[in-house]
Amino acid sequence: MTRFLDSDAMGDEELVERTLRPQYLREYIGQDKVKDQLKIFIEAAKLRDESLDHVLLFGPPGLGKTTMAFVIANELGVNLKQTSGPAIEKSGDLVAILNDLEPGDVLFIDEIHRMPMAVEEVLYSAMEDFYIDIMIGAGETSRSVHLDLPPFTLIGATTRAGMLSNPLRARFGITGHMEYYEENDLTEIIERTADIFEMKITYEAASELARRSRGTPRIANRLLKRVRDYAQIMGDGLIDDNITDKALTMLDVDHEGLDYVDQKILRTMIEMYNGGPVGLGTLSVNIAEERDTVEDMYEPYLIQKGFIMRTRTGRVATDKAYEHLGYQRFDK
């Protein structure tokens, strides 16, 4: 079954996201704290005619880290080279990328926490002093070659900032914590998307979609497309609050933005473990999901919305979880 509330990009969504991507900070909706800081740092770097300090963007998937990287490059008026941690398998791959940079370029590395340690270590001198030392040849004939690099800005994006080594994390002069979006910001994003794709939607429908999109623009845009389909087949094409509710109910997205996987997690905790505490590994086995998937994709939203608490002995379902799913609590 397709999980419509998965915050990772699926299929042609990356193409759609590029179409919707704002170009400048003034067009970027939400994340005001990060934007306000970046605006000052970017203007100061341009005033001094220097490259911007290296930037680390971290937070849950689907919140616009990649979009923000492109916006930063546009604000600086420079080129952006894009890659990802898993794509850089060995040091030579990174050396080739670094050697291709022009002065002032932005190098964007998505999922930077997934780079091998040997590759990561190449970045240390590159980030701090704009040079790398590479080994040429093998055995007794090998020699070290010093390679100067032009000043550049590295933007790293990660969903798991805690997995970055201390030496790498310390080399980022700017950090931006991307947080779940407020409903009013998501409503504005949904209305903007609808306008770009010439969809007819009421404000009430956009607000309802925002409320059930887990604070995540990627999910909001995905659900909007499915609600549009429902409106075209089951209605007259207008996306109103009634059509929206029926479509999202069909997709198993409830009024709190929880889908069948979220509810399965909560029901398992309540029915099998009396609400907890239960270890993450045990819970993952019971719902047939990878531990990392539960920790990265499902748990953050459930914690943020107050359905789950983390304790020293494990995860615990809250009173709100019991009430939301219609369970009576007998352990109090």
UniProtKB/Swiss-Prot annotation:
Residues that bind ATP, according to the entry? L20, R21, G62, K65, T66, T67, E128, D129, F130, R171, Y181, R218
Q: Provide the residue positions that the database annotates as binding Mg(2+).
A: T66
- Enumerate the Gene Ontology biological process terms: DNA recombination; DNA repair
The subcellular location is: Cytoplasm
What GO terms are given for molecular function?
ATP binding; ATP hydrolysis activity; four-way junction DNA binding; four-way junction helicase activity
Span list, region Head domain (RuvB-H): 255-332
Annotated region Large ATPase domain (RuvB-L): the residues are 1-181
> What's noted about domains in the record?
Has 3 domains, the large (RuvB-L) and small ATPase (RuvB-S) domains and the C-terminal head (RuvB-H) domain. The head domain binds DNA, while the ATPase domains jointly bind ATP, ADP or are empty depending on the state of the subunit in the translocation cycle. During a single DNA translocation step the structure of each domain remains the same, but their relative positions change.
Please explain the role this protein plays, according to its UniProt record.
The RuvA-RuvB-RuvC complex processes Holliday junction (HJ) DNA during genetic recombination and DNA repair, while the RuvA-RuvB complex plays an important role in the rescue of blocked DNA replication forks via replication fork reversal (RFR). RuvA specifically binds to HJ cruciform DNA, conferring on it an open structure. The RuvB hexamer acts as an ATP-dependent pump, pulling dsDNA into and through the RuvAB complex. RuvB forms 2 homohexamers on either side of HJ DNA bound by 1 or 2 RuvA tetramers; 4 subunits per hexamer contact DNA at a time.
Q: What is this protein called?
A: Holliday junction branch migration complex subunit RuvB
Organism of this sequence = Streptococcus agalactiae serotype Ia (strain ATCC 27591 / A909 / CDC SS700)
Tell me the gene name: ruvB
